[in-house]
Design a protein with these regions (language model features):
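N-terminal helix-turn-helix DNA-binding module of bacterial transcription factors
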Residues: 1-59, 325-328
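Short acidic/polar active-site loop segments enriched in Thr and Asp
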Residues: 13, 59, 114, 169-171, ...
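Short beta-strand segments enriched in small/hydrophobic residues
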Residues: 16, 54-67, 162, 170-179
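Generic structural signal for helix capping and beta-alpha/helix-loop junctions
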Residues: 24, 56, 101, 125, ...
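Short amphipathic alpha-helical segment that frequently serves as the phosphate-/nucleotide-binding helix
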Residues: 32, 77-78, 190
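Bacterial carbohydrate/catabolite-sensing allosteric modules
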Residues: 41, 82-87, 133-137, 141-329
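Alpha-helical recognition/docking segments in bacterial nutrient-uptake
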Residues: 48, 60-161
Length: 329
């Protein structure tokens, strides 16, 4: 059944049917009752997306992220969803791992979102949507868009200071793929690592490997580090998931953590506490919630003014770090 058929049966215009079924004013009670009866007689169910579009708002927010299956992203999504649900908004998730697949998804949905949350992706992805689509970035600071982030460089320096103070000098970095955006979270963390190692006079480019922010990538990267003539005594992983993969490979290689190799992660996922992982804690759910609040505020105001929020991190020292054996002896 269509809205036109309901209008014909009730003897009113399509616009009147739309207003009556959406509960809007300027519809006589008798007319509203007639429209509702006609809709029931025809078993008509209005399309919620069409109704939303007719009002000028879809009540849908898009969230774009490179790895939608990561625990880090899941925490951000959870925080954002909680805020959005209370305001009656749905959340639609895009993956940006492939520019082609993102463009295809965005092309199908660009008219169906009121705003975008961009997690660890550059503001250029906003061009896939309508020019006036509101957007907020998470993890990547932008002058043009509102953002929520942590001080990734400082957090990385803090983690490195811990390892250096323990006496480690052969410290490897399980990084992510090179980014085109110098202000992206992985790039800022990498820069913090490089600065700490250079200041300590022990930077070695062969100790920086790409773990791809995945379990498989981190495992392969760890094996390549262990194959070096002078392997590292400590690993700093830019995510807890990569740190967990590294620990698994170390144990497979009969190396003890932290007695033989120390490991530091980044995020402080729930699993990190269970495994006793030393890691940088960042408030992932808070970042997601804050991004949703900023975005909804921008949508309501419609002024396009950007706002930036910075959240604190702290190093949680547990049981995967210790002084290297050379220092202990």
């Amino acid at each position: 059944m269509t809205i036109e058929q309901v209008a014909q049966r009730a003897g009113v215009s399509v616009a009147t049917v739309s207003r009556a079924l959406r509960g809007l004013e300027n519809v006589a009670d008798s007319t509203r009752a007639r429209v509702q009866q006609a809709a029931m007689d025809l078993n008509y169910r209005p399309d919620p997306h069409a109704a939303r579009l007719a009002s000028g708002h879809t009540k849908t927010i898009g969230l774009a992220a490179p790895l939608v299956d990561s625990r880090y992203i899941a925490q951000i999504v959870s925080g954002a969803e909680e805020v959005l649900a209370k305001r009656g908004f749905d959340l639609f998730i895009f993956t940006t791992r492939s520019q082609r697949s993102f463009s295809s998804s965005a092309g199908n949905r660009h008219l169906l979102v009121d705003g975008m949350i961009l997690v660890d992706v550059g503001p250029d992805f906003r061009s896939q949507f309508a020019v006036d689509t509101a957007a907020v970035t998470v993890g990547l600071q932008s002058n043009d868009l509102s953002s929520v982030s942590i001080d990734n460089g400082a957090a990385s320096l803090h983690a490195m200071a811990h390892l250096l103070e323990l006496g480690h000098r052969r410290i490897a970095l399980l990084a992510g793929p090179e980014s085109n955006h110098p202000s992206s979270a992985p790039q800022l963390r990498r820069r913090g690592y490089e600065q700490a190692m250079q200041d300590a006079g022990c930077f070695d480019a062969e100790l920086v490997v790409d773990g791809a922010f995945t379990l498989t990538g981190a495992a392969e990267a760890t094996r390549s580090l262990l194959a070096l003539a002078n392997p590292p005594t400590a690993l700093f992983a830019l995510s807890d998931e990569m740190a967990i993969a590294a620990i698994s490979v170390l144990r497979e290689s009969d190396l003890r953590v932290p007695e033989d190799v120390s490991v530091v992660g980044f995020d402080d996922l729930d699993l990190a506490e269970v495994l006793g992982l030393t890691t940088v804690r960042q408030p992932m759910r808070q970042l997601g919630a804050a991004s949703a609040r900023l975005l909804l505020g921008e949508i309501e105001r419609g002024d396009g003014e950007s706002e930036h929020q910075m959240f604190e991190t702290n190093l949680v020292v547990r049981h995967t770090t210790a002084a290297p054996r050379s220092v202990e002896s």
